[in-house]
Amino acid sequence: MLDVNFFDELRIGLATADDIRTWSHGEVKKPETINYRTLKPEKDGLFCEKIFGPTRDWECYCGKYKRVRFKGIICERCGVEVTRAKVRRERMGHIELAAPVTHIWYFKGVPSRLGYLLDLAPKDLEKVIYFAAYMITFVDEERRTRDLPSLEAHVSVERQQTENRRDSDLEARAKKLETDLAELEAEGAKADVRRKVREGAEREMKQLRDRAQREIDRLDEVWSRFKNLKVQDLEGDELLYRELRDRFGTYFDGCMGAAALQKRLESFDLDEEAERLREIIRTGKGQKKTRALKRLKVVSAFLQTSNKPKGMVLDCVPVIPPDLRPMVQLDGGRFATSDLNDLYRRVINRNNRLKRLLDLGAPEIIVNNEKRMLQEAVDALFDNGRRGRPVTGPGNRPLKSLSDMLKGKQGRFRQNLLGKRVDYSARSVIVVGPQLKLHQCGLPKAMALELFKPFVMKRLVDLNHAQNIKSAKRMVERGRTVVYDVLEEVIAEHPVLLNRAPTLHRLGIQAFEPQLVEGKAIQIHPLVCTAFNADFDGDQMAVHLPLSAEAQAEARILMLSSNNILKPADGRPVTMPTQDMVLGLFFLTTDDEGRNVKGADRAFGSTAEATMAFDARELSLQAKVDIRFPVGTMPPRGWVPPVAEEGEPEYQPGDTFRLRTTLGRALFNELLPEDYPFVDYSVGKKQLSEIVNDLAERYPKVIVAATLDNLKAAGFHWATRSGVTVAISDVVVPEAKKAIVKGYEEQDEKVQKQYERGLITKDERTQELIAIWTKATNEVAEAMNANFPKTNPIFMMVDSGARGNMMQMRQIAGMRGLVSNAKNETIPRPIKASFREGLTVLEYFISTHGARKGLADTALRTADSGYLTRRLVDVSQDVIIREEDCGTDRGLKLKIAVKGADGVLRKTDDVETSVYARMLAEDVVVDGKVIAPANVDLGDVLIDALVGAGVEEVKTRSVLTCESAVGTCAFCYGRSLATGKLVDIGEAVGIIAAQSIGEPGTQLTMRTFHTGGVAGDDITQGLPRVVELFEARTPKGVAPISEAKGRVRIEETEKTKKLVVTPDDGSDETAFPISKRARLLVGEGDPVEVGQKLTVGATNPHDVLRILGQRAVQVHLVGEVQKVYNSQGVSIHDKHIEIIIRQMLRRVTIIESGDAELLPGELVERSKFETENRRVVTEGGHPASGRPQLMGITKASLATESWLSAASFQETTRVLTDAAINAKSDSLIGLKENVIIGKLIPAGTGLSRYRNIRVEPTEEAKAAMYSAVGYDDIDYSPFGTGSGQAVPLEDYDYGPYNQ
C-alpha cells in the first residue's frame, strides 16, 4: 500500500483500457458470485479468489496450502496466491468488453465533453452511441476526387438506363392498350368496359413512371450524399446508408455505437482543432465565439495533459475489489448483497451473450441491439439513472451505482473519509458537577475503566499485580479492588475530550482532567455549559481519549477548558456565571436602598469582624455599613480618599482605607484577585460580564480560572442562602390595569364608530387599533414594573439577568397584548388577560398560531443554519496563517470614535467588532508625536488611550488587504480572539471564521417579514438574508444605484415608473425601471453621486463591485451581514466575515488573454493570474487583463483548485469529470484534502515547520563544547528545548490550584 506521508500531490486522470488491465489481477468472465452450497466464491466469478485473493488469511481456495509459512506461493491446483485476506480490499479485476462502450460521465455530463471535443450536439451523439444513426468515420477524399468524373458518368449511364427502361415499358404498355381496345371494339363491348380498361392501363403506366422516378431520385440522393460526404456526418436512414455502402463502400467507412466514436477519436487531430478554434476566437463574434471558447477549453485540456481522448471510450471495465461490494449471509440462509454486484452481473451477462452472438455470426441488427444493451448496462453501473429510467431492484428501488457510492452524505467522501467512527470513546447523560474545578469533569468509574483499559492493564503488569497482559485483562474484567487504585493513578493528569453534538464551534469539544465518580452520568462544570450549549434535561455527551503523548499535550495546552475562556467569535469571555450563580451574586451585592435592615450604619474594623456579626444574626448582608479594608486592597475606581485630619498621613495607594459599603459586597470582592479595584455596586449579569472580561484582559489564565471557580461557588452558596422561591402569589397583577384597559377600550370603540360611519378606511382602522393597544400594553407593563417590590423573587431574577425578561413578565402579570395571525399580520384584537388571570377560549386560540410557528421555524432554522455552516467551512477551510508578516502597507481606515452633540469624543458602537484585536497598519501621530506605533495590537486599553488623545480614525491591517499568496499572515489577521494573543502561524482561521458565523445562525430569525403599512414590500431578513449575501445573489426588490455623477429625472406613465440619470459629463443617460410602489430616496432634479442608492431596498453586490470596485463591495457585504447579526444581539468580529468575503473575491475573469496562457472568459485564482502576468511581462509580452469576480460561497467552493475538496462538497460527479479531463493535480494545501487521504492536516501542530524540527545546539553551546577543558566546565544552560521557542509553562501551572 501507498504511504500517505510520502507524497505531496494527488492527480486524477482518464484511464485507458491498458491502464485498467495493468491494475487488474485477472478477468472476470462469469456473472456468478458464490456457490450457495459451499458458500465459497465461484471460479472466474465476481468474487473469484484467484483474481482477488484468498477469503481466509494464508489459505488457498482448495486448502492445499495453509499457514503463513507458504506466504507468496501461488497454488498450482487452484491458482490462488497465499496471502492476507485484506488484499480483497485492494485487488481489482476487469471485464473485457466484446464491443467498446462510452463512459456516461463524458457523454451525458453537462456540458457533454465528448460533444464539445467532436463538435456534436448531445442528441446526435446519443443517436450514434445508442445505434440510431451511422457515423462516417473515414472518407478517402483523394480517391473520390480522382474518380468523381468516371463515377458521375457511371451514375449518368445508370440514370439513362432507368429512363430508357421506363420509356420502353411505357411504350409496350401503350401498344398493349391499343390492341386490347381494338379487340374490345371488334367484340362490340360497351363504352363502360372500354373506359375501365383504359383507366386500368393508365394506372399501371403511372405506377411505372412513379417507380422509375423514385429510382432516379434515390440515385440522385445517393450520388449527392456521396459527393458531399465528410467525416463525422451522421446518417439516420439505414436504407440510404446501405445503398451508399453497396455502391461506394470502398471510398468511405462508417459505423454505429461507441466503436464509431472510438475510431473518430483515434484519428482526431487535437493540434489542428486547437489552431482552428483559436482562429475563430480571434475573428468570430457572439455565439460562435462563445462555443469556440468552450470547445477550446476541452481541446486544450487534452493537449496540455497526458490524457488521451480515447480514454472516454472503454474497451474494458474495471471491477472494484470484492470487499468493497460485499455479500453477507442473513439469518435464514438468504444473502444480502451490494447493488454493485447486480449491476456487474448485468454487464457480464450481456457481454457474454454479445460474444456468443458475434461467434455465431448473428445478423447485424441483433448484434447492434445487444451492443446497445451492453452500453446501457455499463451506463447503469457507472451512473444509474443518468440516462433513461434507472435500473431498479426489489420494490422498485433504483440500484446504487458507482457514482452514488461517492455522492451525498452517505457517499464515500462524507461518510467514510471526512467523518469516521473512532474507538476509545464513550457516551453518557450529563449532570451538573458544582464541586468540580473549571478544568475537571466527573467520569463514571465503569466508563473510565473501559476507556483506560490498556493503560490500566499495562500498569498492573508494571506493578507486578499481574504476571502478563492476559491475567491483567482478567483482573480488570472481574473488577478487583486494586484495579480501581491503579485506575486513579493512570487517569491522573491524563486529559479526556468531551464533546456535545451539535458541535457548532470549536468550544463544542474541550479537554478536562477526569475525576472518578460513582453512578453512570458524566459530571460537567456549570461554567462550561454556555460553550457547549448544554443543559441537564437529558443531554448526552461523548468522551474521547487522547492516546499519544503529543495528543495529550495538545489537549492539555490548547483544549483544556480553563484555557478556553474566550469565545472565538468576538474575543469576549464565554465561561460566565449564569442563572443561579448570577442570582446568588446579585443577592450578595444588592444594598438595602432605604429599607430598614438589621445592623445598618455600624462600623467594622475588617470584613472578618462584619462576618462575625452576620453569623451572629446581628447584621444583614445588604445593610450599608463602614468597613476598613487591609493593606493591598484596591479602592473602587473613581474613589476619592477623605481629607486627612491634622497629624494623620495622606492616603497613599495600597494603604488601608475605610469604605461605606455592604458586607455582601465586601465578601464578593474577596472572590476577586487582591489587586482588582473594589466593586461597589450591584452585580447582575451585565456587570459580571464586564468584570470577567476585564479579568480575562488583565490577568493570566490561572488566576482567571481560579476567580471564576470562586464566583461559581459563591454564586451557588448565596443563591441557596437567599431562599429565593417562586410562587403564584409572587405574580402581582397591577391594580391600575383595569382602569388602563377601560380607558383604551373607550378609544377602541371611538375608532370602530368612525369606521362604521365611513370616516376612515379598513386599513386606517387596523393601524389605529394596533397603535392604541400597543400603547395600552406598554402602559400596563409600566404599571406592573412600578408595582413589583425590589425583593420580589421573580423581579430579582429578571433584574439580575439570571432568567427571563420584562416581556415575559408582562405576559404573566400584565397583559399578553397583540398577536399575529397565520399571514404574519397583527390581529387588531388584543389579548387583555395575563397568564396569571387566565385566557378565554378565543384568546387562547388566537395565540396558538404564534407558538406553533415558533416551533416550526426553529426546526427549519436548525437545518438551514447547519447547511450554511457547511458551505462556509468549505469555502474557507484552506485559509490558514502561513507567515508572520506579508509586508503589505495597505489596510483599512476604521472609525474608533465619534463626536457627540456635546462635542465629546466617544467610542463608536461597533468598535468591539471592527477595530478591537487588530494590528495598526501605520503609526498613530497626534501633534507630531507618535502615540501608538505600527504593528501594535489594538486592545481595550490602547483604544481608550487613543480616544482619550482625540483620535477618531485609525488605519489597521486586515485580511482583505493581506498579500500572502496562500492563506493569510498573522499581522493582517491580528489577535487570535480565542487566546487574546497574536495569532500563531498554523492557526486555521478560516474554519474559526466559518464556525463563528454559522454557530449563531440558529438564533437568527427565519422568513421574510411583512412590513405592512403603505409600502407593503417583503424584506428579507435573518438567516435567509445572510445566505443571500454570502451566495452573492441578486436580492428581491433590488434597489438600483447610480452609475454616474449627474441629476435625476422621474418619468412616470400609467403602468410604469422610470428613474433617469443624466450624467454631468454629457455621456449617455441611464434609465432604471422601478416598481410603482418603490419608495424613492431621490427627488426630481436631485444631484446624485456615483454608486448612490436611488430607492429603498437592498443593493445588488455585483452592481456595487462593477460600479464602485472591490473595496466598496467588501465594506458593503461586511456591513450588511453585521446588520442582520446585530439585530439579533449577536456579536461577531468583522475579521471573520472578511475572511469569507476574501474567499468570495479570490478569482478573476480574464477579459483579454494577451500573451498569457489563459483563455478569455476563464476564471482563475488571483495568485495564478498575477504569477502568469509577471512571467509574461519578464519575457516582454502583453499581460492578460481581467476583472475581479464576486462568487457565492457554493460556487467558490466548487471552483477551488483542490478537486478532492470540491468533490467532497457538492456535485461530486461533475467535479470529478472535470478534474479527470483536465488531469488536475491536488497539491494538498487545504485541510479537507489531507483529512480525506489520511495525512496530518497542514494546520496547527501538523504544519511542516513544527513537525520537521532538528534539535541542534546553539553557536554559543558549540563554542563552549570546543573550549571545554573538563566535564564540569560544560555549561548546558543555553540549550533550552532545542532551537524552537519554549512554551511558557507557568501559564498552565495548576500546582497550587489543584490542592
From Swiss-Prot:
Entry-linked InterPro entries: DNA-dir_RpoC_beta_prime, DNA-dir_RpoC_beta_prime_bact, RNA_pol_asu, RNA_pol_N, RNA_pol_Rpb1_1, RNA_pol_Rpb1_3, RNA_pol_Rpb1_3_sf, RNA_pol_Rpb1_4
Catalysed conversion reaction: RNA(n) + a ribonucleoside 5'-triphosphate = RNA(n+1) + diphosphate
Binding annotation for Zn(2+) 2: 886, 962, 969, 972
SUPFAM superfamilies: beta and beta-prime subunits of DNA dependent RNA-polymerase
Domain of life: Bacteria
Pfam families according to UniProt: RNA_pol_Rpb1_1 (PF04997), RNA_pol_Rpb1_2 (PF00623), RNA_pol_Rpb1_3 (PF04983), RNA_pol_Rpb1_4 (PF05000), RNA_pol_Rpb1_5 (PF04998)
UniProt enzyme class: transferase
Cofactors that this protein relies on: Mg(2+); Zn(2+)
GO cellular component, one term: DNA-directed RNA polymerase complex
UniProt binding sites for Mg(2+): 535, 537, 539
SMART domains: RPOLA_N
Enzyme Commission number(s) of this protein: 2.7.7.6
Binding positions (Zn(2+) 1): 60, 62, 75, 78
Single Gene Ontology BP annotation: DNA-templated transcription
Positions of region (Disordered): 385-405
Cofactor note: Binds 1 Mg(2+) ion per subunit. Binds 2 Zn(2+) ions per subunit.
Role summary: DNA-dependent RNA polymerase catalyzes the transcription of DNA into RNA using the four ribonucleoside triphosphates as substrates.
Quaternary organization: The RNAP catalytic core consists of 2 alpha, 1 beta, 1 beta' and 1 omega subunit. When a sigma factor is associated with the core the holoenzyme is formed, which can initiate transcription.
UniProt similarity note: Belongs to the RNA polymerase beta' chain family.
HAMAP family associated with the record: RNApol_bact_RpoC
PANTHER family: DNA-DIRECTED RNA POLYMERASE, DNA-DIRECTED RNA POLYMERASE SUBUNIT BETA
Identification of the protein by name: DNA-directed RNA polymerase subunit beta'
Higher taxonomy: Bacteria, Bacillati, Actinomycetota, Actinomycetes, Kitasatosporales
Gene: rpoC
